[in-house]
C-alpha cells in the first residue's frame, strides 16, 4: 500500500517505513503528525484518486529531526562592469518517518 500526499507545496509518494525530508513543520521532535491531504491511495489493485483529496484518508508520521539542507550558492553577475554579488541560502527541513497509511 502506498499513497501520494501533498505537504509544503510538494507531492510525495510514500509507503509505511519511508523516511522523508519535507518542508519545515512547527512540530517538536517525537510528535506524531497526520497528513489529511492525500491525493491518491493505492492498495494492491485498488486505486483511489481524490478530487482533489481522498475522503477520510490520512497518513500518520513521526517527526524524527529538524535541520537545514546544504547551501545553495546564488551569483549575480553584470558583464563588463566588474560587478559580482554572491549569496547563499539554506532551506530548513523536517525529517519524518511514515508510520501508518489508512482510510
UniProtKB/Swiss-Prot annotation:
One Gene Ontology cellular component annotation held by this UniProt entry: ribosome
Keyword rRNA-binding listed: yes
Key words, A-Z: Ribonucleoprotein, Ribosomal protein, RNA-binding, rRNA-binding
Pfam families per record: Ribosomal_L21p
Gene Ontology terms, MF aspect: rRNA binding; structural constituent of ribosome
UniProt keyword Flavoprotein present: no
SUPFAM superfamilies membership: L21p-like
InterPro entries: bL21-like (IPR028909), bL21-like_sf (IPR036164), Ribosomal_bL21 (IPR001787), Ribosomal_bL21_CS (IPR018258)
SUBUNIT field: Part of the 50S ribosomal subunit. Contacts protein L20.
UniProt-listed HAMAP family: Ribosomal_bL21
UniProt function note: This protein binds to 23S rRNA in the presence of protein L20.
The family this protein is said to belong to: Belongs to the bacterial ribosomal protein bL21 family.
Name listed for the protein in its UniProt record: Large ribosomal subunit protein bL21
Amino acid at each position: 500500500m502506498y499513497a501520494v500526499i501533498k505537504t509544503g507545496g510538494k507531492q510525495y509518494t510514500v509507503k509505511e517505513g519511508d523516511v522523508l525530508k519535507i518542508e519545515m513543520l512547527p512540530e517538536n521532535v517525537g510528535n506524531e503528525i497526520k497528513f489529511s491531504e492525500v491525493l491518491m491511495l493505492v492498495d494492491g489493485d485498488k486505486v483511489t484518486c481524490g478530487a482533489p483529496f481522498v475522503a477520510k484518508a490520512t497518513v500518520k508520521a513521526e517527526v524524527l529531526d529538524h535541520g537545514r539542507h546544504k547551501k545553495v550558492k546564488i551569483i549575480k553577475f553584470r558583464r563588463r562592469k566588474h560587478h559580482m554579488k554572491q549569496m547563499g541560502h539554506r532551506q530548513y527541513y523536517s525529517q519524518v518517518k511514515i508510520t501508518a497509511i489508512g482510510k
